[in-house]
Amino acid sequence: VTAGPPRDPAPQPTALGAQDRRLLDALVERIFPRGGVPETPGAVAMGAAAYIDAALAGPYARHLGEYQSLLAAVGGQFPSLPPAQQDAIIARLESGTLDQPEAERQRAFFDLLWRHLREGLFCDPAHGGNRDFVGWRTIGFPGAQFGYRAEEQALDARVERPPAARRDLPEAARLPTLPPPARQETRPRPADVVIIGGGFVGAVVAHRLVRSGREVVMLEAGPPRDGRERVMDELLATSVRNIGGDAKFNDEIPTWRRNAAETAMPVRPGQGLETALGGNSVAWGAAAMRFYEDDFRIRSATAARYGEAAIPAASSLDDWPLSYADLAPYYDAAEDLLGVSGLAGANPFEAPRAAPYAMPPLRTSGLGALFAEAAGREGYHPFPLPAAILTAPWRGRHACTYCSFCSRFGCHVDAKASAQNTVLAEAMEGGQLRLVTGARVLSIVTDDSGAAVGVRYRDAAGEHRQDGGTIVLAAYAFENARLLLLSRGRRHGRGLGNETGQVGRHYMTRQQPAVFAQFEGRRLNRFIGPTAQAMAIADLSADHFDHRGLGFIRGGRIAAFNQYLPIEASGILPPGMPRWGAAWRDFFRGSYNETAMLFIDPEILPYATNRLDLDPDHADRLGRPVIRITFDIGDNERRLIAFLQEAATRIATAMGATRLWRRPPLTGPISTHDVGGTRMGDDAERAVVDSLGGVHDTPGLFVLGGSTFVSLPAVNPTLTILALALRAADHIAGKAPMR
């Protein structure tokens, strides 16, 4: 990788005094020291310390006090100590064994410092770190590019490009298909339908309803968009950070405990959850698979093949109240809206389709071909992952350029489907959709009969009431459950939909127990292409194999994903690898372009004890309780994950991996596949909504989104969420179901 055009950052402010800055310089220089063959500059020469100092005067100002306190604990004599003594102090800081402050603060500070240091080493130089691109050059990352040719994705291909000039990268003012200015509702007046949530689900439902002649008001808690989410910059990364879409979430961070005996503590997701117009549709990874036929009759199919005793006694596993055949025409409609690329029949286990995909799949990368060949030798049936990413022009959108910035970014050519480039602009054209952004819904209003008739919301101008003939709750799983529980009335003392205590129960979230594989001496070029440009196997998904004697039911998908950006990648280390010093420096320098991830999507069974409720001890800035997550995986999931990791290890070994390591089975209580909490079902005693999203105990109220899921199959949920939303929208509009 050659040096690119200079990115001269603006003069950087500073927050630290001279002594603290000297301490910081010495500390980060020891964490990422100069050395190696060929020699790598240290953290100070690479601009990492200057980056941190400037960030503490700006976006990270809230951390300044913690830096000052912990730098004092490290001690002013640190810069003059011999390297061995400096190393001993760093080790004690990391382990929380310095004399002061308390251990947890020390460990948390080291984690924070390590994250900020990695940003300073590998961010775009426009932010003041990665001086002269030296961080990128050290690991072989070409920086921001508009796209790559197929031959550059071949195994061992040399990619020798300078980073694109900053002035030539996409900016909001020059980006295509931005939605028209939001028609902000300034004086609420009754509407036929009020939709809570302006994400993918809300936008798709609004589009369907306005086309049927309905007057719709959509309330979105987050800000509108101006295109900044499409900037190719890992530090700004998620459009969440770039547009302030995390502001609402930061005000109401959920708490988590594994079981009811523990004390719940605030927990942040490892991936951004975005509150902004269009929701996560702008930053999603765009994998777009349908569920399998037996996913909808999961309990009866399992019992028929293995007996009821095979189902874990603690699991609340149940069949869905609809079949694949009921949803198939809406899968067709959702794929048509998005523009899904794929190869019908390539996955031998897929459910029947009425037609081929709209366009061919994303091209196969060198890594994908290596995975497919090895998986085939192991007896599996690899296939290209269907994706809501165009491989040919489609309705004014452009084909994928295979840049490095897809998942967690907006698409600079609109190849990746989003609410903005599929339904929002068209829905707003006729004036029947009225939009309010920055509107935090406080509660759903019911009348004396118990029917939903409106919502109370708060915006910058104060508190308002918006009435409507039908209310559609289409927020994320957490907010769907939270609003139902907060909306209490004379006939709903426990909250809406909660007459039988079902709201919040059966919560499920995807675990991500990947297997990492290093191929020493090879160039994988995983920084090229979208995440969804993947080869996958479904042989071990659902009930596609005999489970007798295995000690678990159901399965999981294994896939070789692309998109590997350096700030994130620098934090992925094998067990026993230190997070600092020459060993970390040399490992990451050599392994960045040699490391693959075999991503595992295990099926997570529902348990009534895994639930969402209101935390009595934690509140948001308005004084309202936040969501408390009670979640753990069961023995079934632990055995399943171990089985899938063994299979992934065999595939990686067949691919020629020289080093392998695994994530733990429990990767957290929040992912981007968070479902359940307002389960659908025909029996009002055991479910919150019916198969169309209608709330059993609250006429006029519909709940849509992943929160209505009965189970969490080994498939990305978005396509099914949208198909269910389209089906519900037809019902609300008075149309007969499609067949």
Where are these regions (language model features)?
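Mature-region segments of soluble proteins
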Residues: 6-10, 18-26, 30-177
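Extreme N-terminal leader/targeting segments of oxidoreductases
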Residues: 134, 146, 153, 160-193, ...
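N-terminal Rossmann-like FAD-binding beta1-loop-alpha1 element of flavoenzymes
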Residues: 191-218
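Glycine-rich loop(s) and the adjacent beta-strand/alpha-helix scaffold that form part
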Residues: 211, 215-217, 221-236, 430, ...
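N-terminal FAD cofactor-binding segment of flavoenzymes
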Residues: 221-295, 323-333, 372-376
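Conserved redox-cofactor binding core of oxidoreductases
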Residues: 242-243, 250, 260, 264, ...
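FAD cofactor-binding and catalytic pocket of flavoenzymes
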Residues: 259-261, 265-273, 277-284, 288-304, ...
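A glycine-rich dinucleotide-binding beta-alpha-beta segment and adjacent secondary-structure elements
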Residues: 384-390, 399-406, 442-445, 593-604, ...
